[in-house]
Swiss-Prot record:
This is Methylenetetrahydrofolate--tRNA-(uracil-5-)-methyltransferase TrmFO. GO terms for biological process: tRNA methylation; tRNA wobble uridine modification. InterPro entries: FAD/NAD-bd_sf (IPR036188), MnmG-rel (IPR002218), MnmG_N (IPR040131), TrmFO (IPR004417). GO terms for molecular function: flavin adenine dinucleotide binding; tRNA (uracil(54)-C5)-methyltransferase activity, 5,10-methylenetetrahydrofolate-dependent. FAD binds at G8, A9, G10, I11, S12, G13. Catalyzes the folate-dependent formation of 5-methyl-uridine at position 54 (M-5-U54) in all tRNAs. Its EC number is 2.1.1.74.
């Protein structure tokens, strides 16, 4: 029986173990939480959740809901556990204790899983290994990963800017840059700027389970849009002022959008990284006239979040380019969110199995949410890599005119067919 090592028994590590055990591997699982917990871990069970509502929509007309359905077809431990422990279906809310208990009991009772409860400090490439230690790895392992991928490819924090769908913005309020065809300026008059400013400074802030996270971010040079605004109105005005746009009554301030290098459907709202809660972010973004009816694909976040530049250091199957016996999965790869982290672990484990059986790599295509998400983090912009969560902008669009429920149902039906074909051909 072949042996594979998994580092970390969080969401992605637990999923990776399950997928490998199903494929008849002897799995060594390293987990340190019974000896040394990170600041948000509260017990010794596997797959700790910080919140009970972490699974978002269950509807297949939502990209996150469709991702869960794709994962059900791929027999995901995490989604099986969430369905078992659910207390509400839409959005999918779970009882955290039941969820963690389901996963822990299954894995601990499996005869082919060897649990090693100690800190994993030195990466040993003599054994095929999946590193899945999540956003809060131990300092020792952080240093080991830095040595493995290079310090410039390892990040301790993220500052993710909101993304809107390019085709959904109102071009009547947009000026294109004369210097860079990837830049777009959303214009605001003075009253619109004042309204935006007041929304930002009065917005409700997300309270992290990690103590002093916002202070930690600020101390390391990461400033949110609300921090800038609360410093002074003039400082926000300076941030939202483009040198190449002449200031007039209708261009008192500008919000800059930048087209993503990998996916031209994505426009990032530059400098809008934030810890503001999503309902308030939604109101703030919609207050920009050009974005009043925009489809928001993802919201801004700022986290203490360990992740590697996957597009730079991983092959297109989550395998380290410089060492084929090492794979990465979960939040560490830039798949952002519990479900997304688990999704990457499924695909990673499938490809570990294929690597050890000398079979070609296998990842679902971009007509699926799971495939488009994995392909994005593995092939995206190497220079400005940011974590990504499931959204419709990643998925091949079928040239939809509108992302209404009818259009999204078509995308969902196609994705389910594609996943079934992927399973038939590869699993």
């Amino acid at each position: 029986m072949k042996r594979v090592r998994v580092i970390g028994a969080g969401i992605s590590g637990s999923e990776a173990c399950y997928q490998l055990l199903k494929r008849n591997y002897l799995v060594e699982l390293f987990e340190v939480k019974s000896i040394k917990k990170n600041p948000i871990q509260t017990n010794d069970m596997f797959a700790n959740l910080a919140y009970s509502d972490s699974f978002h929509s269950n509807e297949i007309t939502s990209a996150k809901g469709l991702l869960k359905q794709e994962m059900r077809l791929l027999d995901s431990l995490i989604i099986n556990a969430a369905d078992y422990a659910k207390v509400a279906n839409e959005p999918l809310l779970v009882d955290r204790y039941k969820f963690q208990e389901y996963i822990t009991n299954y894995l601990r009772s499996h005869q082919n899983l060897k649990i090693i409860e100690k800190e994993y400090i030195t990466i040993d490439d003599s054994v095929p290994t999946i590193i899945a230690t999540g956003p809060l790895s131990s300092v020792n392992l952080e240093n080991e990963i830095k040595n493995l991928v290079g310090e410039s490819n390892f990040n301790l924090f993220d500052k993710v800017e909101p993304i809107v769908l390019k085709s959904s913005i109102n071009l009547n309020y947009v000026q294109k840059s004369a210097l860079d065809d990837k830049l777009f300026y959303c214009t605001l008059n003075k009253n619109e700027f004042e309204y935006l400013y007041n929304l930002i400074i009065s917005a409700e802030i997300f309270v992290s389970p990690l103590p002093n996270e916002i202070k930690l971010l600020h101390d390391n040079g990461f400033r949110s849009i609300e921090t800038v605004a609360k410093s002074s109105k003039n400082e926000l005005k300076n941030l939202l002022q483009a040198n190449e746009i002449r200031q007039t009554e209708n261009t008192y301030a500008t919000v800059l959008l930048r087209e993503d290098d990998y996916n031209e459907n994505f426009l990032r709202i530059v400098n809008f990284q934030t810890s503001i809660k999503i309902p308030w972010q939604n109101e703030i973004i919609k207050a920009v006239p050009a974005l009043a009816n925009a489809l928001i694909l993802r919201y801004g976040v700022m986290h203490k979040n360990d992740y590697i530049n996957s597009a730079n250091v991983l092959d297109d199957n989550f395998q380290l380019k410089s060492n084929p016996n090492i794979f990465f999965a979960g939040q560490l790869t830039g798949t952002d969110g519990y479900v997304e982290a688990s999704a990457s672990a499924i695909i990673c484990a499938i490809n570990v199995d294929r690597y050890l059986r000398n079979l070609p790599k296998a990842i679902p295509n971009n007509k699926t949410v799971i495939g488009s998400l994995c392909n994005y983090v593995l092939i995206a912009n190497k220079e400005d890599f940011q974590p990504m969560e499931a959204n419709w902008g990643l998925v091949e669009s079928m040239n939809l005119v509108s992302y209404n429920n009818e259009g999204k149902k078509k995308l969902s039906d196609r994705a389910i067919s594609e996943i079934k074909e992927f399973i038939k051909q590869n699993l």
